Structures are given as C-alpha cells and as structure tokens.
Amino acid sequence: MFRKVLIANRGEIACRIAATLHEMGVRSVAVYSEADRGALHTRVCDEAQWIGAAEARDSYLNAEHVIAAAQACGAEAIHPGFGFLAENAAFAEAVEKAELTFIGPTAGQIRAMGDKREARKLAEGAGVPIVPGAEGVDAQALVRAANA
C-alpha cells in the first residue's frame, strides 16, 4: 500500500481520486497550474504542488514537471486520472524510470490499446465478444468502387 499518491489531474476526477485515497488511508497530493491555484481539488487533497503556467502543455501535459512534483513531495506513485497523460505510454515509462509507480495500465498495454488492430487481436485472443469488422478488406478496391 502506498503512503502518498500524487494525482496528475484536476477537477472532479482529482477530487474523486482524493476521496478514495482518503478512504484507504493514503495521503493525496494535488497538482495545479497557475490557472488552478486554489481550485477545489487543491483544497481536498492533503498537499498541493505547483507544476507550471496556465497552459496545459506547460503544466498538466508536462511529464517532467509532474514527475518532479511527485519526487519533491515524496509521493510513491502517480495516478493520472483520465485525459492529459493517462494514455501516454512514454509518461508511464518515465514514471517507472523515476522509480515511482504508475497507477494504471503498463506502457505496453497503453500502446497496444492505442492501436485499433492490435487491441482487436488482444480482445479476440481473450475471448471478448467483438462485432464483425473489415479484416482483410482491400482498402484500395473500396476506394475504386466508391469513385466508380
């Protein structure tokens, strides 16, 4: 069990993650940009770390800032919430490289699910029911037929 988790998100999702962490007896750390200073998620968490300017690319999407914030406050893990860095395989790898735990799928799983064909193959292999698709269809033949 972790003692402290940094939540790499804002708003309602960060508040919900913080509430769950509190129920589990785990300290929560919010991150915030200049635009979110004093926002609700920064007040419901046990701590808050500033991660950059108002633009998301300078804060919530900046993996280096998020990881540095986790290291600075002594968090053992990072929960990405959804959006922002949650589906970024390189971020998941960077978190692991920083000797922190990424709470979510592995980088390999993120990559596989990001590729529709690979995700479909994995689902079929796992016995998940899937709708029929256009496997093996000649895309060029379809284009020619549409243009005829």
Protein language model features and the residues they cover:
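N-terminal beta-alpha lobe that positions the nucleotide/phosphoryl donor
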Residues: 1-148
